[in-house]
Amino acid sequence: MSNKEVKAALKSARDAIRNKEYKEALKHCKAVLKQEKNNYNAWVFIGLAAAELEQPDQAKGAYKKAIELEPNQLLAWQGLANLYEKPNQTDVKADLADVYQKLLELYESGDKQKWYDVCNKLVELYHQEKKYVEVAETWQKLIRMKQEEGAEKTELHQLWKKMIQLLKDSTRNQDNKTGQLLLTAFEHALHSADTVPGEDHQNLYKDFIQCLSKFHEVARLEKACHDMMALYPTMSYALEVLCLHFVQSGTLSEEALHCFSRLLEMDANSGPGIIGFGIKCLKENKYREAVKSLTEGLQKTKQCPAAWYYLAEAQMKIHEHRNAVLSCNQALEALGTPEGANSQWKNLALQLKAEILIKIADASAAEEAIKALEQIADGSSDPMVLALRGQAYLNKGLMDQASKISQELLLSHPHLAEAHALEGFIHYSQENYEQAEKSFLNAIERKAGTAEYHQYLGLTYWFMSDETKKDKGKALTQFLKAAKLDSYLGSAFCYLGNYYRDIAGDISRARGCYKKAFELDETDEESGTAAVSLSVELGDMDTALSILNEVTEKARPGTAKWAWLHRGLYYLRTGQPSQAVADLQAALRADPKDSNCWESLGEAYFNRGSYSTALKSFRKASELNPGLVYSIYRAAALEQILGKYENAIATYHEILKKTENYVPALKG
């Protein structure tokens, strides 16, 4: 076949392809290859025809042969790209990306529009494969090409915005290189915006700041927030983000305080602003205000782990331990989300939770505390965590484990107050008061500002002996110090009340201490009862009733027996039987087996004239406690009033068998 014939055969092959006669085209190409086995066009035409005949392997082989012959010729690369783009081609995306890369190289110095088309296809391919670094680098090449061509600022702005769209899903991967490329795209988009200030620019700034928060770019975040605040002084968004950043960073600098104040001036209902104010109150030891503000702020801005932690801390300071545990759980829940993940805050929240559970001091809380401590990273080597673990074991009754930790800590960390305190708690629980005294004195020497150590030293003196209980310089001094260091420590005020009532005989001062203890802890029945009893003794019924009214108003059914009983007895004494009946019934709902309460209820019914019901109440009292002669007598007297004479006589005889000279029964 001559050169002329080869050209003619190739022309025939081209015409056959144009006419969709692909098998005919293959015949012409094969004829050419017999003569010229390295004919580039013949291999390209075979690739085209085979692709149309759905023979992809043959097509691929032909294109690759052509590329081998002429690696910088376009036709074979274009054909291979078309082949790989067909829907029936699978597992070829990596190969297709290589083909696009080569086409970009070949188009770069020539057809710019085709270069852009291929570049877009390559970016789309990388995006489908979630290869975000390649997406960013390829798109940046496109932008550079546009810049070299002198593209308008508006077009470049749209291209940077498109890059942001392409990379926005990459923030889930937390890949640093992609993150930096995304932030660069934001910065270029912001600088190339036409309308500044304007709504689009404002929204772009918001997205940029949100992105900086996710990547923990502290310096850039602060700068971006300040820049946005300067451009949009009436918008609170940037200031809110900055305030939350300060909250999460755990720092309370002058700048942070200024931001909190400025935000509240701008928007008094701003969640982050109210949270910031709450943290300020916490640092100033205004614990109740802190709890109020942090609770309010968190209703508006729930996903803020640090704020939940600070709320738990404030609640612990005012001894709202159950609520504080719930706040710690909220902090840990918020830290469980990808946005909230932070190992430092997680460890702090777990440790605080354990500390609070230990203060609750029952076995189930101790078990929960141990579980929390086990989750702390590197907790086994932290002496503070070990000291808490020792206390949890002690609360759970695991004395051997608690003692082992105590001994190890005293050897490895003899200067740690918590190590000596743990030893003191163990001795105290075993009633080894002399040893407990030494341990608590050692703890106080190392950390004098801890109210709990003074409280326990005071309790040690209280139970050690009558001498130490009565010695003003011992128990009393320690309880006073504890109360001064922690004005929310109700138990310190309760023991001060015990001292003034039982040792000093100062009823007025004792009443004040019990009242304070009860105000701090409304579950403290001992203090509440004592405050009421001493108020009655002092003739101050108004105070006694105000305490009882406050408790009964808040009480759930079946609770606060002591308050219902005291108020019921007061109404009984003052001739108000109907009110007495209602209160004594409420007391019995809390404790249906209290025989004395049934007896008092019988008396109230009797005074009200409800004799049959009174009889039942007295009988119930004597059933529960057969030794209550008065209840048996009252039942007999009521049977007599109700005309049940035989029953009454039998009951009187029953009383006289037990108590021969019981005058009321003899009279009956």
What are the roles of these predicted feature ranges?
Residues 45, 79, 121, 162, ...:
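Canonical tetratricopeptide repeat
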